[in-house]
C-alpha cells in the first residue's frame, strides 16, 4: 500500500512538473505581454531566475519606448545575474546605462555591470584581463557617483581585485627563484617591491627571497664577480634586517643570518 501511494505521488509530481513547463512554454509563445510581464516578476520574486530571464528577454522588444521599458531591462539584467550568468548580465547592465542614461536606475546598473565583471574575475594564477576590466569599471563608477552608499562595497571589491594582481605579480617573480634563475629573480622581486611599496606582507617575502637569490647567485659566480655579488647580498640582508627583523619567524632570520656571516667570510677571503 505504501509503495502504491509513493508511486502515485511520483506520478503526480512528474505530471505537475510537465504541466508547469508546458504552461511556461505557452506563456512564452503567447501575445499577452502584460500577463507575461506579471509572470516574469512573480518568477523573479520567487527566485526562479531562469524562467524570469526567459520571459523578460522575450518582453524587451515589445516594451521598447514604453513606460515599463526600464523595469523590463533592469529585471532582465538582475535575473541573469542571480542565475549566475554574469557575463551576459554585465553586458545587459552596460546596455541599460547606454539606453537609459538619465534613469534613476542608471547608477545601480553601472555598479552592477562592474560587479558582474568582479564575479567573472578568475583566480590570481589565471589571465587577469577581466580583473583589470572590473577595476576600471569600479573606478569609473566611483568617479561618477562618489557620494553613493555603494562606494564602500565598490572599494572592498577593488581591494580584492587588486590583491589578485599583486598575488599574480609576486608569484611570477618568486617563480624565477623557485626554478633557480637567481639573477632574474633579483630583478623581478625588486621590480615587485618598487611597484607595490605599500604591501608589507608581500614586500617582506619578496625581500627575503631577494637575499636568498643574492646568496645563490654569488655562490655560482666566477671569481672576478664574487666580491661585487657578496657585497650586494650583505646590503640587501641589512635592509631586510632593519625593516623586518621583528616581524619574521626565527627560522628565516637564523637562515639569513648564517648566510650573511658566510658572505662576510667570503669577502674577507677575497681581499
Segments predicted by a language model, with ranges:
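Sec-dependent bacterial lipoprotein signal peptides
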Residues: 1-20
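Acidic, polar-rich low-complexity tracts and alpha-helical solenoid repeat scaffolds
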Residues: 5, 19-271
